[in-house]
C-alpha cells in the first residue's frame, strides 16, 4: 500500500507540477519591462527577444547605465535558455561586445561574462565571478545576488573558508531583508524540513527550493543542522570533495567516463548516503532519471521523500508530520502583506496536494474524518491560491476524490 502511494505521488508530480511556459508574444507598450527571471514570470523566448531590443535602445541612449545593460543581457540569456542555447551564443556575444565598449571592468559586465563562461565546456569562469565579488553594489538585485551565492557554494569554499562563508551569509541575509523571495515560498521550504530527522541530508533540485532553504538557515537560523545539497552541484569536483570532507568521509572517486551525467549522480548519491550514514531526503522536484532505481528506495513522508533500503510504514510518519510538525494553517489565512505570486514558481504549492493527498485517503480509510477533512481544506486552499485555470486546478482537486 505504501509503495502504491509513492508511485501515485511520483507519477502525478511528473505530469502535473512541471509547468509549461505560457506564451506572451505581444507587447502592450514600447517601454521595456523589468526582466525578473523565469522563476518569477512565464514568458516565451519571443518575449525576451523583444525585451532585449527595447533594453538595448535604452542602454544605447545612456551607455553607462549598468541596469539597462544588465536587463538587456538577462533578456538575451533567457531567450537563449528557452531555446536550449547556452554559452557564447551570437545573441549574448552581441550584447557583451557592447558592454565591453561602454562598461568594461564593471560589476555588471564581469557577472555577465561569468554567467556566459560558466555554460561553456572547459572554460574557467571563476576569474569573472571573483572580479564581480570585489565590486558588489549596495543595491544588488535578487538575480545577481543569487548568482554569486550559487558560485560561492559551487566553489566548495562555503564549507570551510570563513571569508567565503561570511560573504555568502551577507548575500543571503540581503535576499531576506529585501523580501526577495515571497513568504509563501519560505513557508513551504520550512515545512519540507520540519519533518526531517536531525543532521539530515536534503538533496534538492531547482533554484527556488534551494534558495528558500538557505534563507531559512542563514537569515532565520532555522534547520542549520541539515545539509541542503543541490543535486546538480554533485557533478562539480570542488563542491563534491568539500561536501565529503564536511561529512567526515573520504572524497568520492569518480570514474574517468560515465555513460551519462545521471549515472554519475546515481553513484555519488549512493556513496554519500551510505558512507555518511545520515538520514537522507529528496525534494519532490527530484528527477528520478538522475538516479536510475532511486524511486524504489524513496518513500513519501509528507512533503519530501526519504531514502530507505528497507520498507517501513511511511504513511504513519507522514501523518505524524501533518499532525505534529507541519505548519499548514497559513494556507487558510488571508494575505496580510501583498506580495508577488511568482507565476514561474507558484506551482511549488501544488506539491502540498500531490504529496499529501495520499495522507487524506489514509485518514479516510482509518475512519478519521476529522483529520481527513482538516487536511483536505489545507490542500484545497493551496491549489486555490495559484493562478492556474480552473480546469487545471480541478485536476488537483480530483486527487482527493475517493474514485480510483
Segments and roles (model prediction):
Residues 1-30:
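Bacterial Sec-dependent N-terminal signal peptides
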Residues 13-16, 153, 203, 299:
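Generic detector of intrinsically disordered, low-complexity, polar/charged segments
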Residues 195, 199, 206-210:
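Local sequence-structure signature of Cys/Sec-based thiol-disulfide redox active-site neighborhoods
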Residues 211-215:
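Phosphate- and divalent-cation-binding pockets in alpha/beta enzyme and binding domains
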Amino acid at each position: 500500500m505504501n509503495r502504491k502511494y509513492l508511485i501515485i505521488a511520483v507519477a502525478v508530480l511528473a505530469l502535473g507540477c512541471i509547468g509549461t511556459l505560457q506564451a506572451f508574444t505581444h507587447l502592450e507598450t514600447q517601454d521595456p519591462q523589468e526582466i525578473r527571471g523565469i522563476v518569477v514570470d512565464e514568458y516565451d523566448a519571443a518575449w525576451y527577444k523583444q525585451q532585449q531590443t527595447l533594453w538595448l535602445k535604452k542602454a544605447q541612449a545612456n551607455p553607462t547605465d549598468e541596469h539597462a545593460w544588465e536587463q538587456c543581457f538577462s533578456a538575451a540569456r533567457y531567450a537563449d535558455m528557452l531555446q536550449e542555447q547556452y554559452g557564447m551564443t551570437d545573441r549574448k556575444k552581441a550584447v557583451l561586445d557592447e558592454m565591453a565598449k561602454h562598461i568594461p571592468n564593471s560589476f555588471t559586465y564581469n557577472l555577465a561574462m561569468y554567467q556566459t563562461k560558466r555554460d561553456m565546456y572547459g572554460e574557467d569562469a571563476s576569474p569573472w565571478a571573483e572580479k564581480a565579488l570585489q565590486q558588489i553594489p549596495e543595491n544588488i538585485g535578487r538575480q545577481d545576488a543569487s548568482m554569486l551565492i550559487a558560485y560561492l557554494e559551487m566553489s566548495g569554499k562555503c564549507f570551510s573558508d570563513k571569508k567565503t562563508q561570511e560573504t555568502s551569509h551577507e548575500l543571503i541575509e540581503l535576499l531576506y531583508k529585501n523580501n526577495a523571495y515571497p513568504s509563501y515560498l519560505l513557508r513551504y521550504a520550512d515545512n519540507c524540513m520540519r519533518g526531517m530527522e536531525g543532521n539530515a541530508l536534503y538533496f534538492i533540485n531547482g533554484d527556488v527550493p534551494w534558495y528558500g532553504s538557505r534563507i531559512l538557515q542563514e537569515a532565520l537560523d532555522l534547520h542549520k543542522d541539515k545539509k541542503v545539497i543541490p543535486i546538480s552541484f554533485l557533478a562539480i569536483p570542488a563542491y563534491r570533495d568539500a561536501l565529503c570532507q564536511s561529512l567526515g568521509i573520504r572524497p568520492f572517486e569518480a570514474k574517468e567516463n560515465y555513460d551519462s551525467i545521471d549515472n554519475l549522480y546515481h553513484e555519488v548519491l549512493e556513496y554519500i548516503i551510505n558512507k555518511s550514514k545520515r538520514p537522507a531526503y529528496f525534494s519532490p522536484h527530484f528527477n528520478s532519471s538522475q538516479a536510475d532505481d532511486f524511486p524504489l528506495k524513496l518513500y513519501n513522508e509528507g512533503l519530501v521523500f526519504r531514502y530507505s533500503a528497507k520498507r517501513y510504514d511511511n504513511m504513519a510518519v507522514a501523518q505524524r508530520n501533518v499532525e505534529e510538525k507541519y505548519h499548514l494553517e497559513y494556507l487558510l489565512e488571508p494575505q496580510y502583506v501583498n506580495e508577488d505570486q511568482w507565476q514561474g514558481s507558484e506551482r511549488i504549492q501544488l506539491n502540498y496536494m500531490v504529496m499529501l493527498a495520499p495522507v487524506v485517503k489514509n485518514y479516510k480509510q482509518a475512519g478519521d474524518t476529522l483529520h481527513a477533512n482538516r487536511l483536505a481544506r489545507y490542500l484545497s486552499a493551496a491549489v486555490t491560491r495559484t493562478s492556474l485555470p480552473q480546469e487545471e486546478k480541478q485536476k488537483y482537486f480530483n486527487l482527493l476524490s475517493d474514485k480510483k
